[in-house]
């Protein structure tokens, strides 16, 4: 067996579909977006899109349509998944809780039938009498829409026309009527049929049209008054309704293919069209009123509006605003203007939604040397191509820094009474205090009257009645703002030194050894109210006011030396309300009361980087739900700050962390700074909404990223990136990319648009001694598109394209590696290519080119001709391993700097992927799954160890460990194969057993070892081992990690229990969704835990949690089994959430 945990680190971002309607209520205009398995529901407001709910479906959304049957006050949603689960959903809201109710559901799969090449088509009759589905060739499936039917029943009608391109229901017909484009040996034609529910068959339709344009691909049904249908082709747009036929062939649409459309007006007089190049058109239907008052179509007109992201779907919202959903680039909200701008465009982008898809390749690098990986992906395609830099955690963007060693604390001040913004920064050092004046972006040292500068400050700030306060080791000093003068001072009666202090706008608590004193701040007076003695010395304290307490805190939180406890005391009496023994020997160093998402918490940080956090009841002072995390290795200082009107906590240490709340769970996000000892929020004229941060040597002022888990930076390339690798010595990335050029009249080709490879700082072009240019069997014709491939050298800091190297005509760059070879000290970029000609079934020749980049120059060091396409290359024990068509070949690097073949392995169909570990090589084949080879250094050859005999069409492979191999195949499944070293017979040993099966529902393009999180966050009990990241076509980033058998069994038990408690949207069984499914077979999932389901445990209500844990046996590490509590599982699941 193999025990694995698979979880989403970034949900899919590519938009597959979008619809608008009135789903949440009759008044709301909603936008619904499908991102593969996720459904996002928005309300369209004057300010933009407001998210309402996100729903995870147990299936890939293939069809999504809103409709309103008679008698309904708002729209219902029909969804069909790729595994043929159909459901009708309704939105229900009661108070705060939002539910998506499944009104009806069923599976509409046929046992036999060939799935259509043009995919799944789902349509709804405008009168809501039926839903029509085209799933298989030669069959049209009908789901009658009866009011009260809970189960969706369907029947098939035979279609003589086997190859249907597109189909729609027509408007204004007595009986439901379909109109479709189909292909037969003579060409493409349009036909209509009436659907009879009673006879369950087709009747002759009102009209048909033979021999439409050969590329006709889309049907648009036009509402009344026009009725009929518009057929969209590559070169023409035609309108039919039986009586009338109108055709136009505007030259403007020929350049590219129209791929999506959307109706603007309810009466169908305007349609938006989007093409594959990201151009947006308006199709206008001009009307003509007849003598008898009827309206007929006079003319069709197409206008180019401008450019958007390459659209997968379009939907018109309101007031000239359109949502452009994209699969190949970022989605957009665009505004259509009445007048065009200087470039002649009517389109203005208002908002952009990040999409990582399609992730074609990626690599993990630790660019900031902090032990934390960043993921750099090759994302998007064509003009939407980009690199995306993804890191977990929060970035601080530095705006100013001053060399100031030894800072022990810092506070912002507003020095004058009327000021809204901070103008002063007070810095504390051992034995002294310094004051910095902020004037715009200038910073200068100054003195404040009434403040002392020869003592260390423990606290400083603005307090009530237009006063300032300074607490030093000697005294508490109250200073008036205008004029600046000391108005009151409090000292410990015996003159002892203050050791810790906390203050809010009207209260002060100071500790002198074991004694605590409570003071109140009045106009020009500090009034001592009470004092008490604790049994041990006070290590830290806090009186932050919570809730609506008018800035007064009724509670005081303290941490003590010696007994290592945290206590909540009542003010002013210092009565003990709660005592929490923290255990261990390490003293608490910082304590803080705070509120996240209207829940109150107590945070207590120890001197070794551990942090305890509790729920805090502000009425009773009681603590509950104790939890512990490890944030760093040094004493941690906790400070609050606000970002976008929410409170967050900054934990200063050698691993600075921002603590915030999401879905009422605390999230710990690391910050991209090496270490921070002290921080304070700063909001000055020159540095608005900033933070001031101090480490051992420097004071830095900066702004903080939006508080979220993953941060994504985009580097647009405007062409398609294919492969990426990182080269540390040159501090560069190598990227293979391709741009499209068009053959011009002179026989040369021109680029469609400026892009990374045409705008590099320097460039070079391949000239090869290996191939004479006359060998090209292919002549390109005028207007034909050709791909031009390049190696881009990109700076790791600025992401500037330093150099672009263009390959030969018809030469496609397929594989890339950065490595050292043999005893040669240089590091090379090595590219594998293929000469691609349309006439050849597979490439017959290619090259391996060795480049060196140094001192800003790219030099070709060596090239090697090969008889085929170099699909994959890896460095292998100082040699170069390459797969070329069906061969796996090992090259050694000679002292003459040439590649020499050492050995070959031939037993493959098409060897597309290579991964290595030690002397083992994993080969992923186009259709023959995976194969394990071992290299024998003594004999200098390959030995075939074992192979998986299942026919899996591979899309990516990875080695998990010495015995387990991970594969992804083209039906969206993951599997794990295991080497059976203990088998008794040779034959058994040669079989890789499939021990893990799982339906991911995503097409994986790339696996790589690495992690997005710091490697020591959380307690050491984290039950996972290793981390493999994967990137998919839909822009999802996931993670596979290995579990021990006992953890696997616990989580499997928990998964089964969760499936009983959590009701799936559309009533689709989790076990059905995750079962391994190809055209050949369906098998239940095994060897994988669905991490997304496990993590959803944290989002369910407490009673449901109790239901999940009832009688669950759990080993807490002592080796003894006991019944688990909800808190045990919360802790387990929170640990698991920290691996991504």
Swiss-Prot record:
Task: Point out residues bearing the modification N6-acetyllysine.
Answer: 1067
Show the segment(s) annotated as WD repeat beta-propeller B: 391-708
GO biological process entries: apoptotic process; biological process involved in interaction with symbiont; cellular response to UV; DNA damage response; ectopic germ cell programmed cell death; epigenetic programming in the zygotic pronuclei; negative regulation of apoptotic process; negative regulation of developmental process
UniProt lists the gene as: Ddb1
Recorded protein name is DNA damage-binding protein 1
Residue numbers spanned by region Interaction with CDT1 and CUL4A: 771-1140
Q: Where is this region: Interaction with CDT1?
A: 2-768
Q: Which Gene Ontology cellular component annotation is one that this UniProt entry carries?
A: nucleus
Q: What does this protein do?
A: Protein, which is both involved in DNA repair and protein ubiquitination, as part of the UV-DDB complex and DCX (DDB1-CUL4-X-box) complexes, respectively. Core component of the UV-DDB complex (UV-damaged DNA-binding protein complex), a complex that recognizes UV-induced DNA damage and recruit proteins of the nucleotide excision repair pathway (the NER pathway) to initiate DNA repair. The UV-DDB complex preferentially binds to cyclobutane pyrimidine dimers (CPD), 6-4 photoproducts (6-4 PP), apurinic sites and short mismatches.
Q: Where does this one sit in the cell?
A: Cytoplasm; Nucleus
Supply the alphabetized keyword list.
Acetylation, Biological rhythms, Cytoplasm, DNA damage, DNA repair, DNA-binding, Isopeptide bond, Nucleus, Phosphoprotein, Repeat, Ubl conjugation, Ubl conjugation pathway
> Which terms does the record give in the GO molecular function aspect?
cullin family protein binding; damaged DNA binding; protein-containing complex binding; ubiquitin ligase complex scaffold activity; WD40-repeat domain binding
Q: Where is this region: WD repeat beta-propeller C?
A: 709-1043
Locate the N-acetylserine modifications and list their residues.
Answer: 2
Posttranslational mods: Phosphorylated by ABL1.
Q: Which residues carry this modification: Phosphothreonine?
A: 1125
What InterPro entries does the record tag this protein with? Beta-prop_RSE1/DDB1/CPSF1_1st, Cleavage/polyA-sp_fac_asu_C, Quinoprotein_ADH-like_sf, RSE1/DDB1/CFT1/CPSF1, WD40/YVTN_repeat-like_dom_sf
Q: In which pathway does it act?
A: Protein modification; protein ubiquitination
Glycyl lysine isopeptide (Lys-Gly) (interchain with G-Cter in SUMO2) cross-link, chain position(s):
1121
The family assignment reads: Belongs to the DDB1 family.
According to the record, the residues making up region (WD repeat beta-propeller A) are 13-356
Q: How does it assemble?
A: Component of the UV-DDB complex which includes DDB1 and DDB2; the heterodimer dimerizes to give rise to a heterotetramer when bound to damaged DNA. The UV-DDB complex interacts with monoubiquitinated histone H2A and binds to XPC via the DDB2 subunit. Component of numerous DCX (DDB1-CUL4-X-box) E3 ubiquitin-protein ligase complexes which consist of a core of DDB1, CUL4A or CUL4B and RBX1. DDB1 may recruit specific substrate targeting subunits to the DCX complex.
Q: Which SUPFAM superfamilies match?
A: Quinoprotein alcohol dehydrogenase-like
């Amino acid at each position: 067996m193999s025990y694995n945990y698979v979880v989403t680190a970034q949900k899919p971002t590519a938009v597959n579909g979008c619809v608008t309607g009135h789903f949440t209520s009759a008044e709301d205009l909603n936008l619904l977006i499908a991102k593969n398995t996720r459904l996002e529901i928005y309300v369209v407001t004057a300010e933009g899109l407001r998210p309402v709910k996100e729903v995870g479906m147990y299936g890939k959304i293939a069809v999504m349509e809103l409709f309103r049957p008679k008698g309904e006050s708002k729209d219902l949603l029909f969804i069909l998944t790729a595994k043929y689960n159909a459901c009708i959903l309704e939105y229900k809201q009661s108070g705060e809780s939002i539910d998506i109710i499944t009104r009806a559901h069923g599976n509409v799969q046929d046992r036999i039938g060939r799935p259509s090449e043009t995919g799944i088509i789902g349509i709804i009759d405008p009168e809501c009498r039926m839903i029509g589905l085209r799933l298989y060739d030669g069959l049209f499936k009908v789901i009658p829409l009866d009011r009260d039917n809970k189960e969706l029943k369907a029947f098939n009608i035979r279609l003589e026309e086997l190859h249907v391109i597109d189909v729609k229901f027509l408007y204004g017909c007595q009986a439901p009527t379909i109109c479709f484009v189909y292909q037969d040996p003579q060409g493409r034609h349009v036909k209509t049929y009436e659907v009879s529910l009673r006879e369950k068959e087709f009747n002759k339709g009102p009209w048909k049209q033979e021999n439409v344009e050969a590329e006709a691909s889309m049907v648009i049904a036009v509402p009344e008054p026009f009725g009929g249908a518009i057929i969209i082709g590559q070169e023409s747009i035609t309108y039919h309704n039986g009586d009338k036929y109108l055709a136009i062939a505007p030259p403007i649409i020929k350049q590219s293919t129209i791929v999506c459309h959307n109706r603007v007006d309810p009466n169908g007089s305007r349609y938006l069209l989007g093409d594959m190049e990201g151009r947006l058109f308006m199709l206008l239907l001009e009307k003509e009123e007849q003598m008898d008052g009827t309206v007929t179509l006079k003319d069709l007109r197409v206008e180019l509006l401008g450019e958007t992201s390459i659209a997968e779907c379009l939907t018109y919202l309101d007031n000239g605003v359109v949502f452009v959903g994209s699969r190949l680039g970022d989605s957009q909200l665009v505004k259509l203007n009445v007048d065009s701008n200087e470039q002649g465009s009517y389109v203005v982008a208002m908002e952009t939604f990040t999409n990582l898809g399609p992730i074609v390749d990626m690599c993990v690098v630790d660019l900031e040397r902090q032990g934390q990986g960043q993921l750099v992906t090759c994302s998007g395609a064509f003009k939407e191509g980009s690199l995306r830099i993804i890191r977990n955690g929060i970035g601080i963007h530095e705006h100013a820094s001053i060399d100031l060693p030894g800072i022990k604390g810092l506070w912002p001040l507003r020095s004058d009474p009327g000021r809204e913004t901070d103008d002063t920064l007070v810095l504390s050092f051992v034995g002294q205090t310094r004051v910095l004046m902020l004037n715009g972006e200038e910073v200068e040292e100054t003195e404040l009257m009434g403040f002392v500068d020869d003592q260390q400050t423990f606290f400083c700030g603005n307090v009530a009645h237009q006063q300032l306060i300074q607490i030093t080791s000697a005294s508490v000093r109250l200073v008036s703002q205008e004029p600046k003068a000391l108005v009151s001072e409090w000292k410990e009666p015996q003159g002892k030194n203050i050791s810790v202090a906390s203050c809010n706008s009207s209260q002060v608590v100071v500790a002198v050894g074991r004694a605590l004193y409570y003071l109140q701040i009045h106009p020009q007076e500090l009034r001592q109210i009470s004092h008490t003695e604790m049994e041990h010395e006070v290590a830290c304290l806090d009186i932050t006011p919570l809730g609506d307490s008018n800035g007064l805190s009724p509670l005081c939180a303290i941490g003590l030396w010696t007994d290592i406890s945290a206590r909540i005391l009542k003010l002013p009496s210092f009565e003990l309300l709660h005592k929490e023994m923290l255990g261990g020997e390490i003293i608490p160093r910082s304590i803080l009361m705070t509120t996240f998402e209207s829940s109150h918490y107590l945070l207590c940080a120890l001197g070794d980087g551990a942090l305890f956090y509790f729920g805090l009841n502000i009425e009773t002072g009681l603590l509950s739900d104790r939890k512990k995390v490890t944030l760093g290795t040094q004493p941690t200082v906790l400070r609050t700050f606000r970002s976008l009107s929410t409170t967050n906590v900054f934990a200063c240490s050698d691993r600075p962390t921002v603590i915030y709340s999401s879905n009422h769970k605390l999230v710990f996000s690391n910050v991209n700074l090496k270490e921070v000892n002290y921080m304070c929020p700063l909001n000055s004229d020159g540095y608005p909404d900033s933070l001031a941060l101090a480490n051992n040597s420097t004071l830095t002022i900066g702004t903080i990223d939006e508080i979220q888990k993953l941060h994504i930076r985009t580097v647009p390339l405007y062409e398609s990136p294919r492969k990426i690798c990182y080269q540390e010595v040159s501090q560069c990335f190598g990227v293979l990319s391709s741009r499209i050029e068009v053959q011009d009249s002179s026989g040369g080709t021109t680029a469609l648009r400026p892009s990374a490879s045409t705008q590099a700082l320097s460039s070079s072009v391949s000239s090869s001694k290996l191939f004479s240019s006359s060998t090209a069997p292919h002549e390109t014709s005028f207007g034909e598109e050709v791909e031009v491939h390049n190696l881009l050298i990109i700076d790791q800091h600025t992401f500037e394209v330093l150099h672009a190297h263009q390959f030969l005509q018809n030469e496609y760059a397929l594989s890339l590696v950065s490595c050292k070879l043999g005893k040669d000290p240089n590091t090379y970029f090595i590219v594998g290519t293929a000469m691609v000609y349309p006439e050849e079934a597979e490439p017959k020749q290619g090259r391996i080119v060795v480049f060196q980049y140094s001192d800003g120059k790219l030099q070709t060091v060596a090239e090697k001709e090969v008889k085929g396409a170099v699909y994959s290359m890896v460095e292998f024990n100082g040699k170069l391993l390459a797969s070329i068509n069906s061969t796996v070949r090992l090259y050694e690097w000679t002292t003459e700097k040439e590649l020499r073949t050492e050995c070959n392995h031939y037993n493959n169909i098409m060897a597309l992927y290579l991964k290595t570990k030690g002397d083992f090589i994993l080969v992923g084949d186009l259709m023959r799954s995976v194969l394990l080879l071992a290299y024998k250094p003594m004999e200098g050859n390959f030995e075939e160890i074992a192979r998986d005999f299942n026919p899996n069409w591979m899309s990516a492979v990875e080695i998990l460990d010495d015995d387990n191999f991970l594969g992804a195949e083209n039906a969206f499944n993951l599997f794990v194969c295991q080497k059976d070293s203990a088998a008794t017979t040779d034959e058994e040993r040669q079989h890789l057993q499939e021990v893990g099966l799982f339906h991911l529902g995503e097409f994986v393009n790339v696996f790589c070892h690495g992690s997005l999180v710091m490697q020591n966050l959380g307690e050491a009990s984290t039950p996972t081992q290793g981390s493999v990241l994967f990137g998919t076509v839909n822009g999802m980033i996931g993670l596979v990690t290995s579990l021990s058998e006992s953890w696997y069994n616990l989580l499997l038990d928990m998964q089964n229990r969760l499936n009983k408690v959590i009701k799936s949207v559309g009533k689709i069984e989790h076990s059905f969704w995750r079962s391994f499914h190809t055209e050949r077979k369906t098998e239940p999932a095994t060897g994988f835990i669905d991490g997304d389901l496990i993590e959803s445990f944290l989002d369910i209500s407490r009673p449901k949690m109790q239901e999940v844990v009832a009688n669950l046996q759990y080993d807490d590490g002592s080796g003894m089994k006991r019944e688990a509590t909800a808190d045990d599982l919360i802790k387990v699941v929170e640990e698991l959430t920290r691996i991504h």
